Amino acid sequence: RQRQMCIRDSIKSLSKTANGRLSGSAKIDFETYIQRQYFKQIIHEANKRLLTMSNHQFILKLKEEANTGRKTNEGLDLSVYSLVTDSERDVKTLSGGESFLAALAMALGLSDIVERSAGAIHPDMMFIDEGFGSLDAQSRQQAIEVLGELAGDSRMVGIISHVTELKEQIDRKLVV
């Protein structure tokens, strides 16, 4: 009888842990925990490029479980860490240009992780639609350099844009 109760308590504790209901711990379920592990990898790869594109001004961070709460996206929220001011803030405070750079970096980070994890999958082509109009000249140049490195890795990068300065910076283009 006591052995059965011990087993039942262990299973109950395991169930609470897997479902994010264990008292005194982070309130995320097992599925979210696994998603966070993959998301951390994507953010790590994204930050490699974001550092370059933001001129070493900021990186993205996954908010800690204790700061996420149940009203959020269950532990998958991002924040921005400023290397200039040594402070952390919500991603909603990013300017339009900064948001574009962060989104581009995340897309490239995801591509890196998919390629690394899937092995046989190698995205040979990437299209980026707009966003460059929200960048200042320096940020635009840094984004173009990062994309140029991708194109140098035997990938085709297509950019859909109305920004005149961007058209002048790209050697091969299709004008419609």
Where in the sequence are the language-model features?
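Terminal ABC-like ATPase head and other globular end-domains that cap long coiled-coil arms
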Residues: R1-Q4, R8-V176
